[in-house]
Amino acid sequence: MPNPFALPEGMALFTFHGRVVRGKRLGSRLGFPTANIAYDPRSRTWPREGVYVGVAQLDGESRGYVCIINQGRHPTVPEGIATVEAHLLGNAHRDLYGLELTLAYCLYLRPEQTFPSLEALREQLDRDRLSAVRWARDNAPYLLTGLDLFPHQA
């Protein structure tokens, strides 16, 4: 697959393309709306389950968004099925259902964890978001044009 993000060679650990589908909306309730992408974990070799910093690009758009990607089974609120979902920084209120989205996994942050409460999960998501912002700032000189690192943010 060609590199749709104009990322430097080797920056993306893994890329994945799929259609945004409806989820449980838990991320939205926690203040971290996500684009859920249908996938079959048996369809190919996938990276290990966990949380990643990445870049997302919607089909038809030239820019990308820094994002937090979760690939796994959500042990705090188990669904039983593996999912891929991405929280796009700076894109909190846009309806993405039905759109095609490409994700580039760029940095493995941590394994999935079971949290004692939804508040503890939300606090970890805040830390993950800060990690994503730091990654973007640290890598900004290496990212090529066309990537909106912090859309709608000062």
What is each of the regions a protein language model found here?
Residues 2-154:
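Phosphate/ribose-recognition catalytic cores of enzymes acting on nucleotide-derived substrates
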